Amino acid sequence: MNIIDELAWRDAINQQTNEEGLRELTENTSISLYCGVDPTGDSMHIGHLIPFMMMKRFQLAGHHPYILIGGGTGTIGDPSGRTTERVLQTMEAVQHNVDSLSNQMKKLFGKDAEVTMVNNYDWLSELSLLDFLRDYGKNFNVNTMLAKDIVASRLESGISFTEFTYQILQSIDFYTLHKKHNIQLQIGGADQWGNITAGLDLIRKKEGPEAKVFGLTIPLMLKADGTKFGKTAGGAIWLDPKKTSPFEFYQFWLNQDDRDVIKYLKFFTFLDKEEIDALAEKVEKEPGKREAQRRLAEEVTRFVHDDAALEEAQKISEALFSGNIKDLTIEEIEQGLEHVPTVEITKDAKNIVDWLVDTEIEPSKRQAREDVSGGAISINGDRVTDLDFAVDPTQHFDGKFVVVRKGKKNYFLAKVMD
């Protein structure tokens, strides 16, 4: 299957220029293509995966991806999708973010020979104002720039000249990469269409209308309920394991809605049509088993992290679901219970009823007695029904904390104060 046809089957194309021309080009030759990301932070989140999954598919189809880290444009800020001006970062912060994102990209795309990393600071920093105006500014019509959505949406609230010129800088990127590396395709999110087409126009003005260059954007990813994909009540889901643990990352995908899971399997995994169709049938006939969600979580966690991180996430998930947490390490407990209600306690042993009330896990002694007697309370993986039981924080997990399970799903973490 041609890469363009595969992307169409996966519903991964929003807009593209000259579909037949791009299909013919990718059918007969190996092309170079690029996608850019500005270093606004020191980690990508799962929203960034959307265009880079497409880049990975091109790579697997025998094409060569170039990843542009915007060390130059990152000092200015992309107005796309913004209603307000970005706060400018220091050069030191930008460079730190460039280094961090470069490392993440190499992990996703593999060996240096299979992907080329570039930084637009290398050429934009050498561009003088006079050269910018004479060699590039002359090729841009202000009326055309004002009509593009990325600018038009900001005219009422106001846009600085700095952000107004962003599309020129991104166009210079495309032109520079085309001239130096024969890059013929730029990929971006749906909000990048205006910037991408501006780059195509610049190349054709500089190189001639016969230049074989193309643009392709990915659809805006929305959940079945109409809300934006990638956000949770706790904020963004990051690719950096220090910001979002592999367990939390795994759980995010595991908890996807039946209405969304097949769409995400198409987009975020490398499973083929036969495998995805089989999982779609299971969603239809046996939704309670959630096999599609489990496969989605496995595939994406393995791709972003690795097999070891996936196995750890699965181990924690199974332990917390079953309540058998005794075999978990301290680090695994902390990872799995990072977002549960947490209280501070002393090392002193105390009667379970009093202890549950003191930690505010139970609202009253009456409720505490009822839950303990009814078998609803587990301490460090053991169900406790004895009202005379003494909670001793020093007995498990090196005396660092006590894990409480109330009912089947509610966990609490009581940390021992130093």
UniProtKB/Swiss-Prot annotation:
It catalyses: tRNA(Tyr) + L-tyrosine + ATP = L-tyrosyl-tRNA(Tyr) + AMP + diphosphate + H(+). It holds the Pfam family tRNA-synt_1b. It is an enzyme of class 6 (ligase). Its main location: cytoplasm. Homodimer. Catalyzes the attachment of tyrosine to tRNA(Tyr) in a two-step reaction: tyrosine is first activated by ATP to form Tyr-AMP and then transferred to the acceptor end of tRNA(Tyr). This is Tyrosine--tRNA ligase 1. It comes from Enterococcus faecalis (strain ATCC 700802 / V583). The gene is tyrS1.
